[in-house]
Curated annotation (Swiss-Prot):
Cited PANTHER family: 2-KETO-3-DEOXY-L-RHAMNONATE ALDOLASE
One Gene Ontology term of the molecular function aspect: magnesium ion binding
Assigned protein family: Belongs to the HpcH/HpaI aldolase family. KDR aldolase subfamily.
Gene3D superfamilies: Phosphoenolpyruvate-binding domains
EC number: 4.1.2.53
Enzyme class: lyase
Keywords from the named record: Lyase, Magnesium, Metal-binding
Protein name according to UniProt: 2-keto-3-deoxy-L-rhamnonate aldolase
Binding site for Mg(2+): 153, 179
Gene this chain is encoded by: rhmA
Co-factor requirement: Mg(2+)
Catalytic activity entry: 2-dehydro-3-deoxy-L-rhamnonate = (S)-lactaldehyde + pyruvate
Biological source species: Escherichia coli O157:H7
Protein backbone atom coordinates (compact mmCIF):
# COMPACT_ATOMS: atom_id res chain seq x y z
CA UNK A 1 0.00 0.00 0.00
CA UNK A 2 1.69 3.16 -1.25
CA UNK A 3 0.04 5.70 1.05
CA UNK A 4 1.16 9.20 1.99
CA UNK A 5 0.39 9.93 5.62
CA UNK A 6 -1.33 13.26 6.19
CA UNK A 7 -2.75 15.06 9.21
CA UNK A 8 -5.21 17.82 8.24
CA UNK A 9 -5.48 19.01 11.85
CA UNK A 10 -1.72 19.57 12.07
CA UNK A 11 -1.58 21.25 8.67
CA UNK A 12 -4.28 23.71 9.65
CA UNK A 13 -2.51 24.52 12.91
CA UNK A 14 0.68 25.21 10.96
CA UNK A 15 -1.25 27.69 8.84
CA UNK A 16 -2.69 29.36 11.93
CA UNK A 17 -6.26 28.45 11.02
CA UNK A 18 -8.86 28.44 13.78
CA UNK A 19 -10.30 25.01 14.53
CA UNK A 20 -13.41 24.49 16.64
CA UNK A 21 -13.68 21.25 18.59
CA UNK A 22 -15.84 19.21 20.91
CA UNK A 23 -14.84 17.16 23.98
CA UNK A 24 -16.01 13.53 23.90
CA UNK A 25 -16.39 11.92 27.32
CA UNK A 26 -19.24 9.49 26.68
CA UNK A 27 -16.83 6.61 25.86
CA UNK A 28 -18.89 5.07 23.06
CA UNK A 29 -18.26 4.77 19.33
CA UNK A 30 -21.95 5.44 18.72
CA UNK A 31 -21.83 8.87 20.37
CA UNK A 32 -18.47 9.65 18.77
CA UNK A 33 -19.88 8.99 15.31
CA UNK A 34 -22.90 11.20 15.99
CA UNK A 35 -20.50 14.01 16.97
CA UNK A 36 -18.41 13.41 13.84
CA UNK A 37 -21.47 14.03 11.65
CA UNK A 38 -22.00 17.47 13.24
CA UNK A 39 -19.09 19.14 11.47
CA UNK A 40 -16.70 20.06 14.29
CA UNK A 41 -13.13 20.49 13.06
CA UNK A 42 -11.76 18.20 15.78
CA UNK A 43 -13.02 15.83 18.45
CA UNK A 44 -11.12 15.24 21.68
CA UNK A 45 -11.55 11.62 22.78
CA UNK A 46 -10.81 11.78 26.48
CA UNK A 47 -8.89 9.01 28.20
CA UNK A 48 -7.87 11.05 31.24
CA UNK A 49 -11.15 11.68 33.06
CA UNK A 50 -13.55 9.57 31.00
CA UNK A 51 -13.31 5.79 31.65
CA UNK A 52 -11.99 4.87 28.21
CA UNK A 53 -9.90 1.74 27.71
CA UNK A 54 -7.46 1.38 24.81
CA UNK A 55 -10.09 -0.69 23.01
CA UNK A 56 -12.70 2.04 23.62
CA UNK A 57 -10.35 4.61 22.08
CA UNK A 58 -9.72 2.26 19.16
CA UNK A 59 -13.42 1.84 18.42
CA UNK A 60 -14.02 5.59 18.57
CA UNK A 61 -11.15 6.21 16.13
CA UNK A 62 -12.78 3.72 13.78
CA UNK A 63 -16.17 5.40 14.21
CA UNK A 64 -14.99 8.89 13.24
CA UNK A 65 -12.58 7.80 10.49
CA UNK A 66 -15.04 8.25 7.57
CA UNK A 67 -15.78 11.85 8.51
CA UNK A 68 -13.96 15.17 8.20
CA UNK A 69 -13.75 15.79 11.96
CA UNK A 70 -10.21 15.05 13.13
CA UNK A 71 -9.74 12.93 16.27
CA UNK A 72 -7.41 13.98 19.08
CA UNK A 73 -6.64 11.42 21.79
CA UNK A 74 -5.93 12.47 25.37
CA UNK A 75 -4.44 9.52 27.27
CA UNK A 76 -4.58 9.40 31.04
CA UNK A 77 -0.87 10.27 31.23
CA UNK A 78 2.20 10.55 29.04
CA UNK A 79 4.13 7.36 29.75
CA UNK A 80 6.11 5.74 26.95
CA UNK A 81 4.16 2.42 26.97
CA UNK A 82 0.77 4.14 26.86
CA UNK A 83 1.79 6.56 24.11
CA UNK A 84 3.04 3.59 22.07
CA UNK A 85 -0.33 1.85 22.37
CA UNK A 86 -2.33 4.94 21.48
CA UNK A 87 -0.19 5.65 18.43
CA UNK A 88 -0.36 2.04 17.28
CA UNK A 89 -4.18 2.06 17.26
CA UNK A 90 -4.03 4.95 14.81
CA UNK A 91 -4.02 8.21 16.75
CA UNK A 92 -2.17 10.91 14.84
CA UNK A 93 -2.76 13.76 17.28
CA UNK A 94 -2.16 13.45 21.01
CA UNK A 95 -2.93 15.82 23.88
CA UNK A 96 -0.75 14.90 26.86
CA UNK A 97 -2.01 16.16 30.24
CA UNK A 98 -0.05 17.53 33.19
CA UNK A 99 3.20 18.49 31.46
CA UNK A 100 5.01 20.72 33.96
CA UNK A 101 8.59 20.92 32.68
CA UNK A 102 10.62 21.01 29.49
CA UNK A 103 12.19 17.69 30.47
CA UNK A 104 8.74 16.08 30.63
CA UNK A 105 7.94 17.57 27.23
CA UNK A 106 11.15 16.14 25.74
CA UNK A 107 10.33 12.70 27.15
CA UNK A 108 6.90 12.82 25.55
CA UNK A 109 8.37 13.83 22.19
CA UNK A 110 10.84 10.94 22.40
CA UNK A 111 8.02 8.50 23.15
CA UNK A 112 6.26 9.44 19.91
CA UNK A 113 9.28 9.05 17.62
CA UNK A 114 10.87 5.91 16.25
CA UNK A 115 14.65 5.47 16.66
CA UNK A 116 17.01 7.13 16.01
CA UNK A 117 14.87 10.19 16.82
CA UNK A 118 13.13 8.72 19.84
CA UNK A 119 12.14 5.61 21.76
CA UNK A 120 8.86 4.47 20.26
CA UNK A 121 8.73 0.68 20.08
CA UNK A 122 8.51 -0.90 16.63
CA UNK A 123 5.51 -3.09 15.86
CA UNK A 124 4.07 -1.85 12.57
CA UNK A 125 2.91 -5.29 11.43
CA UNK A 126 0.38 -5.45 14.29
CA UNK A 127 -0.58 -1.74 14.30
CA UNK A 128 -3.68 -0.19 12.77
CA UNK A 129 -1.65 2.99 12.31
CA UNK A 130 0.51 1.22 9.69
CA UNK A 131 -2.44 -0.74 8.30
CA UNK A 132 -0.84 -3.85 9.74
CA UNK A 133 2.40 -3.36 7.88
CA UNK A 134 0.80 -2.51 4.53
CA UNK A 135 1.78 1.18 4.43
CA UNK A 136 5.13 1.37 2.71
CA UNK A 137 7.81 3.39 4.49
CA UNK A 138 5.51 3.99 7.45
CA UNK A 139 8.35 4.50 9.92
CA UNK A 140 10.12 6.91 7.58
CA UNK A 141 7.14 9.22 7.14
CA UNK A 142 5.10 8.93 10.32
CA UNK A 143 7.00 11.53 12.35
CA UNK A 144 5.95 14.32 10.00
CA UNK A 145 2.28 13.41 10.31
CA UNK A 146 2.16 13.22 14.11
CA UNK A 147 0.83 16.24 16.01
CA UNK A 148 1.86 16.55 19.64
CA UNK A 149 0.03 18.86 22.01
CA UNK A 150 0.78 19.24 25.71
CA UNK A 151 -1.35 20.59 28.53
CA UNK A 152 -0.09 23.37 30.77
CA UNK A 153 -2.35 23.33 33.82
CA UNK A 154 -0.37 24.22 36.95
CA UNK A 155 1.62 27.10 38.39
CA UNK A 156 4.79 25.06 37.91
CA UNK A 157 4.00 24.62 34.23
CA UNK A 158 3.35 28.34 33.83
CA UNK A 159 6.72 29.09 35.40
CA UNK A 160 8.32 26.76 32.84
CA UNK A 161 6.18 27.74 29.85
CA UNK A 162 8.95 29.39 27.82
CA UNK A 163 11.20 26.35 28.20
CA UNK A 164 8.34 24.00 27.24
CA UNK A 165 7.64 26.10 24.15
CA UNK A 166 11.29 25.75 23.11
CA UNK A 167 11.09 21.94 22.95
CA UNK A 168 11.37 20.71 19.38
CA UNK A 169 8.49 18.45 18.43
CA UNK A 170 5.82 20.23 20.46
CA UNK A 171 3.21 21.53 18.01
CA UNK A 172 0.90 23.23 20.46
CA UNK A 173 0.14 23.97 24.09
CA UNK A 174 -3.29 23.60 25.63
CA UNK A 175 -4.32 25.59 28.70
CA UNK A 176 -6.21 23.37 31.17
CA UNK A 177 -8.54 25.86 32.90
CA UNK A 178 -9.95 23.63 35.65
CA UNK A 179 -6.66 22.33 37.01
CA UNK A 180 -4.92 25.65 36.41
CA UNK A 181 -7.45 27.64 38.42
CA UNK A 182 -7.19 25.12 41.27
CA UNK A 183 -3.38 25.30 41.20
CA UNK A 184 -3.56 29.09 41.39
CA UNK A 185 -5.80 28.96 44.46
CA UNK A 186 -9.16 29.47 42.75
CA UNK A 187 -10.71 25.99 42.55
CA UNK A 188 -13.69 25.66 40.21
CA UNK A 189 -13.36 29.34 39.35
CA UNK A 190 -11.64 29.70 35.99
CA UNK A 191 -13.58 32.92 35.55
CA UNK A 192 -11.73 34.69 38.38
CA UNK A 193 -10.08 37.88 37.04
CA UNK A 194 -6.58 36.73 38.01
CA UNK A 195 -7.07 33.37 36.32
CA UNK A 196 -8.46 35.10 33.24
CA UNK A 197 -5.46 37.41 33.11
CA UNK A 198 -3.07 34.46 33.28
CA UNK A 199 -5.00 32.56 30.60
CA UNK A 200 -4.86 35.55 28.25
CA UNK A 201 -1.15 36.11 28.88
CA UNK A 202 -0.38 32.43 28.37
CA UNK A 203 -2.29 32.19 25.10
CA UNK A 204 -0.48 35.23 23.76
CA UNK A 205 2.91 33.81 24.84
CA UNK A 206 2.17 30.50 23.14
CA UNK A 207 1.21 32.13 19.85
CA UNK A 208 4.18 34.51 20.01
CA UNK A 209 6.44 31.45 20.22
CA UNK A 210 5.00 30.13 16.97
CA UNK A 211 2.99 27.33 18.57
CA UNK A 212 -0.72 26.59 18.44
CA UNK A 213 -2.72 27.57 21.53
CA UNK A 214 -5.68 25.52 22.74
CA UNK A 215 -8.45 25.80 25.30
CA UNK A 216 -11.65 24.10 26.48
CA UNK A 217 -14.48 26.53 27.21
CA UNK A 218 -17.89 25.18 28.19
CA UNK A 219 -19.36 28.71 28.16
CA UNK A 220 -19.74 30.28 24.69
CA UNK A 221 -18.63 33.73 25.86
CA UNK A 222 -15.41 32.27 27.26
CA UNK A 223 -14.76 30.43 24.01
CA UNK A 224 -15.19 33.67 22.07
CA UNK A 225 -12.85 35.46 24.46
CA UNK A 226 -10.12 32.84 24.02
CA UNK A 227 -10.46 33.07 20.25
CA UNK A 228 -10.09 36.85 20.52
CA UNK A 229 -6.90 36.36 22.56
CA UNK A 230 -5.46 34.22 19.78
CA UNK A 231 -6.27 30.62 20.70
CA UNK A 232 -6.60 28.67 17.46
CA UNK A 233 -7.88 25.27 18.58
CA UNK A 234 -10.75 25.67 21.00
CA UNK A 235 -13.20 23.06 22.25
CA UNK A 236 -16.55 24.73 22.79
CA UNK A 237 -18.38 22.02 24.71
CA UNK A 238 -18.35 18.58 26.32
CA UNK A 239 -20.73 15.95 24.98
CA UNK A 240 -21.82 14.71 28.40
CA UNK A 241 -22.54 18.25 29.61
CA UNK A 242 -24.47 19.09 26.45
CA UNK A 243 -26.46 15.89 26.83
CA UNK A 244 -27.32 16.52 30.47
CA UNK A 245 -28.29 20.13 29.67
CA UNK A 246 -30.61 18.93 26.89
CA UNK A 247 -32.21 16.41 29.25
CA UNK A 248 -32.79 19.09 31.88
CA UNK A 249 -34.27 21.50 29.36
CA UNK A 250 -36.67 18.92 28.00
CA UNK A 251 -37.80 17.81 31.46
CA UNK A 252 -38.40 21.42 32.51
CA UNK A 253 -40.92 21.74 29.67
CA UNK A 254 -43.16 19.08 31.20
CA UNK A 255 -42.58 19.00 34.95
CA UNK A 256 -43.30 21.93 37.24
CA UNK A 257 -40.52 22.96 39.56
CA UNK A 258 -37.84 22.08 37.02
CA UNK A 259 -35.94 25.14 35.88
CA UNK A 260 -33.83 23.78 33.07
CA UNK A 261 -30.07 23.18 33.16
CA UNK A 262 -28.40 23.25 36.53
CA UNK A 263 -25.53 25.63 37.08
CA UNK A 264 -22.36 23.62 36.58
CA UNK A 265 -18.77 24.38 37.42
CA UNK A 266 -15.94 24.74 34.91
CA UNK A 267 -15.20 21.31 33.43
Amino acid sequence: MNALLTNPFKERLRKGEVQIGLWLSSTTAYMAEIAATSGYDWLLIDGEHAPNTIQDLYHQLQAVAPYASQPVIRPVEGSKPLIKQVLDIGAQTLLIPMVDTADQARQVVSATRYPPYGERGVGASVARAARWGRIENYMAQVNDSLCLLVQVESKTALDNLDEILDVEGIDGVFIGPADLSASLGYPDNAGHPEVQRIIETSIRRIRAAGKAAGFLAVAPDMAQQCLAWGANFVAVGVDTMLYSDALDQRLAMFKSGKNGPRIKGSY
